From Swiss-Prot:
UniProt gene name: rbfA
Protein name as catalogued: Ribosome-binding factor A
Gene Ontology terms describing biological process: maturation of SSU-rRNA
A cellular-component GO term for this protein: cytosol
Function: One of several proteins that assist in the late maturation steps of the functional core of the 30S ribosomal subunit. Associates with free 30S ribosomal subunits (but not with 30S subunits that are part of 70S ribosomes or polysomes). Required for efficient processing of 16S rRNA. May interact with the 5'-terminal helix region of 16S rRNA.
Principal location listed in the UniProt entry: cytoplasm
InterPro entries: KH_dom-like_a/b, RbfA, RbfA_dom_sf, Ribosome-bd_factorA_CS
Keywords: Cytoplasm, Ribosome biogenesis
NCBIfam families (alphabetical): rbfA
Localization of this protein: Cytoplasm
Length: 126
């Protein structure tokens, strides 16, 4: 991704957060955080990664709501960011946060088991 695409992506991320948080009134759309926006080099397409607070059903409902509002969101982006052509938007759930949380949970579990093993060894020595 080139420098211009990166800059456009960062600006879109900021604007999308504002649009989704303030302009959209769809009840299906829950608490959404825009985690990343990746714009293609030709600025024709933008993949928007989102994180949704809630269960799998809430995530799917939020995605459906965002898909329905895609045209409105794109027109808002077009008004806020001066580009020859506003990129086509694709929404995806960002799994990296959940993946990171799972790894952290496993590390804690291993650490706890390791601490438990050390205490057992100390008790045996006494």
């Amino acid at each position: 991704m080139n420098l211009r695409a990166t800059r456009v992506g960062e600006q879109m991320k900021k604007e999308l957060s504002d649009i989704i948080g303030r302009k959209l009134k769809d009840p299906r759309i829950g608490f959404v955080t825009v985690t990343d926006v990746r714009v293609t080099g030709d600025l024709q397409q933008a993949k928007v990664y989102i994180s949704v607070l809630g269960d799998e059903e809430q995530r799917q409902n939020t995605l459906k709501g965002l898909e329905k509002a895609k045209g409105f969101i794109r027109s808002e982006i077009g008004q806020r960011i001066r580009l020859r052509k506003t990129p086509e938007i694709f929404f995806e759930i960002d799994e990296s946060i959940e993946y990171g949380n799972r790894i952290e949970q496993l590390i804690r579990q291993i650490s706890t088991e390791h601490e438990g093993g050390k205490k057992e060894e100390e008790n045996k020595e006494e």
